[in-house]
């Protein structure tokens, strides 16, 4: 069955023309003079805009007054109380939330996969919010760690590392989690950033006895390193300058004489370049 347009009805108000009416024509459509508005359509609902209906022209587009709403929360907007992101209208409240909370558009609706294909209205809303966020962030750097926008801030400058960008206070040591910021650091074997303090500790040699760093000469015994003053008899804590034997640790000759089994006497003093040749008791 085919339908024909009634040429005696105004497209704007759907009322019949009178013989006394001035008729306007556009795109083969007829309007009462008071209903004619250059055959414009609403940018949101695509419905015709007629002169007798409330409408407004903003951001280079024309809307029914009731259709000029925030793309984020659907609040009806007034002429002087709205913001825009890349030509998309939104209320000032949503604009602020989107601008200063980069995860707002996504966190409010969840991931795209969580939106059912049947719920087209919800899906459309989600896409609109995501587009608002993406348009706002175009050309702006996002911190790899906190996912917030990196603003021009002399107290929190950006740091680039490994192809990523961070707020300086978000750029931290992979070992101790302290902030590296703009300070010196080294790159670990796994490609992570390590602060200078942790790097120095990893290279540091500690005394086996006192656990403190060794920064000069040392003695090597059974693969362990000692400060010269820390290498003492494990029994009496006396000097081992004349040699030692291994008995649950280095033992001096006097203490060794108390043992029933003969032991091997060993000399192993070093200036840090290696042990001396071993001798026999």
Swiss-Prot record:
Highest taxon, organism lineage: Eukaryota
GO molecular function, one term: metal ion binding
Any single GO CC term annotated in Swiss-Prot or TrEMBL for this entry: nucleus
Signal sequence annotation: none
Assigned keywords, A-Z: LIM domain, Metal-binding, Repeat, Zinc
Alphabetical list of CDD domains matching this protein: LIM (cd08368)
Residues covered by the LIM zinc-binding domain: 40-101, 141-205, 206-262
Entry-linked Gene3D superfamilies: Cysteine Rich Protein
Protein name: LIM domain-containing protein G
Organism this protein belongs to: Dictyostelium discoideum
Source organism phylogeny: Eukaryota, Amoebozoa, Evosea, Eumycetozoa, Dictyostelia
Gene label: limG
